[in-house]
């Protein structure tokens, strides 16, 4: 099921790319969109993404096994509260200081004004940092309960919304001007990420997950999460720096189309991983985490 849904997601992802290419092509607007739209996910990964992906699932399963449903719900509620505080704060800073955030992706370019549109769109996109964090926790909880449908199908809904936004770009721009069209695709892209996150919430209740959102920095489960996740920080920092330099260099080599070329090419070379490895690794990591908590190391091997 996961592989099938992943294929559907990739198909809609290709359609999304075609819709984007048809709407804004290979242009400065396209590059601005790519830079601004990729940055929220990069920042989420840098601040908490790697830690959540690596550490949340085994810690959650351990708490639920050893302390019960109520304790695991408290752990989830505490983590959500911290995400709202930290990622919400970063999202607010990104909205207010958008040009500075965009500079991290264009610092090699001598033309600072070339990314004005990217900064404008990033003001719409910054809240995605929070949405990605919340969605990651929701997906982790559902995966822990072997419920892979919504976490795998959610990107399809995201793609459909973004496709509709790009399809509306030309008529809206013709009727109300290009700035209105830019607002449409910026708002539509953020709406897609919100729906991708929010559509998973109803499924949580089916598994008895009703977290009480609060903040407790003394929670032992939180400390365990941080301890397990810290080693991934180096990898996420390296990835952020590498991607930032790549985008900045691309804007020097091809000032208007560099980031767009990279984005279109990346879609193809990540395809094998997205179709096969992603779904397998998601399911296997859940089983590995379960077996490790049960100390069934023979099954892990």
Residue ranges with predicted function:
Residues 1-301:
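Membrane-embedded alpha-helical bundles of multi-pass transporters/translocases
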């Amino acid at each position: 099921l996961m592989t099938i849904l992943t294929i559907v997601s990739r198909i809609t992802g290709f359609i999304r790319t075609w819709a984007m290419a048809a709407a804004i092509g290979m242009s400065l607007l396209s590059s601005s969109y790519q830079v601004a739209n990729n940055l929220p996910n990069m920042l989420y990964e840098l601040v908490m993404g790697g830690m959540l992906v690596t550490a949340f699932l085994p810690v959650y399963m351990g708490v639920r096994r050893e302390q019960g449903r109520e304790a695991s719900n408290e752990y989830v509620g505490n983590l959500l509260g911290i995400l709202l505080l930290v990622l919400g704060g970063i999202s607010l800073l990104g909205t207010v200081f958008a040009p500075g955030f965009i500079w991290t992706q264009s610092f090699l370019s001598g033309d600072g004004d070339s990314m004005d549109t990217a900064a404008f769109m990033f003001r719409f996109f910054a809240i995605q940092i929070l949405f990605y964090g919340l969605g990651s926790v929701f997906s982790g909880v559902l995966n822990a309960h072997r419920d892979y449908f919504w976490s795998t199908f959610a990107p399809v809904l995201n793609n459909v919304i973004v496709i509709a936004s790009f399809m509306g770009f030309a008529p809206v721009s013709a009727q109300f001007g290009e700035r209105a069209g830019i607002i449409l695709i910026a708002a539509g892209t953020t709406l897609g990420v919100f729906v991708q996150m929010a559509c998973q919430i109803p499924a949580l209740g089916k598994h008895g997950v009703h977290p009480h959102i609060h903040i407790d920095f003394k929670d032992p489960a939180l400390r365990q999460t941080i301890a397990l996740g810290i080693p991934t920080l180096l990898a996420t920092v390296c990835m952020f720096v590498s991607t930032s330099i790549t985008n900045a260099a691309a804007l020097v080599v091809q000032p208007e189309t560099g980031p767009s070329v990279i984005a279109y090419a990346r879609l193809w070379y990540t395809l094998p991983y997205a179709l096969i490895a992603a779904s397998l690794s998601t399911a296997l990591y859940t089983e590995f985490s379960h077996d490790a908590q049960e100390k069934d190391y023979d099954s892990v091997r």
